[in-house]
UniProtKB/Swiss-Prot annotation:
Entries under SUPFAM superfamilies matching the protein: P-loop containing nucleoside triphosphate hydrolases
Any Pfam family hit: IPPT
Name of the protein described by the UniProt record: tRNA dimethylallyltransferase
Catalytic activity: adenosine(37) in tRNA + dimethylallyl diphosphate = N(6)-dimethylallyladenosine(37) in tRNA + diphosphate
Role, per record: Catalyzes the transfer of a dimethylallyl group onto the adenine at position 37 in tRNAs that read codons beginning with uridine, leading to the formation of N6-(dimethylallyl)adenosine (i(6)A).
Ligand binding (substrate): 19-24
Enzyme nomenclature, EC number: 2.5.1.75
GO molecular function: ATP binding; tRNA dimethylallyltransferase activity
Gene3D superfamilies documented for this protein: 1.10.20.140, P-loop containing nucleotide triphosphate hydrolases
Region (Interaction with substrate tRNA): 42-45, 166-170, 247-252
Length: 313
């Protein structure tokens, strides 16, 4: 996952980082100083009506620095890494054609990887195969299907939890359609990104400080009306916790509260813990990322200058 060295290719900037690390603020500041246009790389910000719980850039922030690929799906709709790559490449081409630089900002590391390294040649979803798998699950339980996957593809089974029906179903579906395991197919990469990419990761030096920010921001979301926002989605009646939108951090815990499974205090506790776990996963991705320049989110001025210096060189 190295920077693309071909200087004949147009430039692009990646601003990556864990949740609550200051990515949005840095990107908006860069928009004031460089000829950049922002493209969101966030699997939660794509959904309309999910603003507070996703920490979506405010109307004022988007007026200062419009973000592309925000509010492009209803929460009932699906959106894959392949969908993102196709949409992002189009936005990047449009930005480059206008003589500006695409700045991709977010924390969905799978999307960044798909964009940078291309996608493995996985088969498209097959509703009939998926239905057959779900019928098996209803009869035998997901634990039995997980054991089946362990025989077919032990590497994937070790990565996928038995209580993760979406990923479990997909791993089985890939094998039933293609005759090849998910592990085999994901080793084959697709097209790389035709840009000279400057990659940055922003995070606090202290993990404790990041945890404090996460807790503070979750309480700020609640004060801003997160429960009301989630209840509006809950009351629609067509959304449930098997959908990617409702599995987003914060919304899943709010759903448990609204359905009476847990009380308010437990929802807050679980929401903060889940957000911390998300940040930990994001940091794990980034530490193994390769060619990336780290920025200290506690020194925003220095971070801004560092990006400008590298991009302008």
């Amino acid at each position: 996952m190295n920077d693309i060295e071909n200087l004949d290719q147009p430039p692009a900037i990646f601003i990556m980082g864990p949740t609550a690390s200051g990515k949005t603020a840095l990107s908006i500041a860069l928009r004031q100083r460089l000829p950049v246009e922002l493209v969101s790389v966030d699997s939660a910000l794509i959904y309309r009506g999910m603003d507070i719980g996703t920490a979506k850039p405010s109307a004022e922030e988007q007026a200062l620095a419009p973000h592309r690929l925000i509010d492009i799906r209803d929460p009932a709709e699906s959106y894959s890494a392949a969908d993102f790559r196709k949409d992002a490449l189009k936005e990047m081409a449009d930005i480059t054609a206008a003589g500006r630089i695409p700045l991709l900002v977010g924390g969905t590391m799978l999307y960044f990887k798909a964009l940078l390294d291309g996608l493995s040649p996985l088969p498209s979803a097959d509703p009939q195969v998926r239905q057959r798998i779900e019928q098996q699950a209803a009869e035998l339980g997901w634990e039995a299907l997980h054991q089946q996957l362990a025989e077919i593809d032990p590497v994937a089974a070790a990565r996928i939890h038995p209580n993760d029906p979406q990923r479990l179903s997909r791993a089985l579906e890939v094998f039933f359609i293609s005759g090849k395991t998910l592990t085999e197919l994901t080793k084959i990469s697709g097209e790389t990104l035709p840009y000279q990419v400057h990659q940055f990761a922003i995070a606090p030096v202290s993990r404790e400080l990041l945890h404090q920010r996460i807790e503070l921001r979750f309480h700020q979301m609640l004060d801003a009306g997160f429960e009301t926002e989630a209840r509006a989605l809950f009351d629609r009646g067509d959304l449930h916790t098997d959908m990617p939108a409702i599995r987003c951090v914060g919304y899943r815990q709010m759903w448990s509260y609204l359905s009476g499974e847990i009380d308010y205090d437990e929802m807050v506790y679980r929401g903060i813990c889940a957000t911390r776990q998300l940040a930990k996963r994001q940091m794990t991705w980034l530490r193994g990322w390769g060619s990336v320049q780290w920025l200290d989110s506690d020194k925003p001025g220095e971070a801004l200058d560092s990006v400008i210096q590298v991009v302008s060189a």
